[in-house]
Amino acid sequence: MFAAACARESAQPSPAVPAQLPASVAVQVSAAMLVPEKATEQAPAVFKTKFATTKGDFTVEVHRDWAPHGADRFYNLVKLGFFDDAEFFRAIDGFMVQFGIQGSPQVSAKWQDANIPDDPAAGQSNKRGAVTFATAGPNTRTTQLFINYGNNANLDGMGFTPFGQVLDGMNVVDSLYKGYGEGAPQGMGPSQDRIQHEGNAYLKKDFPQLDSIKTARLVQ
């Protein structure tokens, strides 16, 4: 799932899921994370989330009226701790940084088809710092997000409806590692298919310089 040219990767043989992740990349999984159909709480009209990352902290402010379905999904994911230990697996200078594939293949499998409806454009643009769900086509948004590095107004009206904005710490977002570039198969970066099936073990082994989220928490 991509932020632009947003088709899923073509179907390819998937490596077997490791029986057990190495202790160094083990991901905490709660029972609630495995039941996406119950993560349906309505988000507040406006709320903030603080991301603690390997490069520092940044805060996102969400406005539900910008994109109600997107805001509700994000709110529930944060409450579940879904983004904890997730990697920023696709970062392209001047364009955007993408994240939101859970580090546990078990969890990823449960959410892969937990789609939410598209939100109609509500006057918000994919400007610098805007936070938006990635999509693979109409009504296919699940858990992947991106933060815009530049003005990507060309994405407006294509199903990429921003639901929030980086309120502070954009310098941290700017500093996230971008050296791997575009993901496979178009580029040399991580394969989303392999992240889904192998989780953080694959990323830590083959892309060790990626930055990651330590925690994402709701704040006042």
Predicted regions and their residues:
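Sec-dependent bacterial lipoprotein signal peptides
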Residues: M1-A4
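Cyclophilin-like peptidyl-prolyl cis-trans isomerases
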Residues: C6-Q220
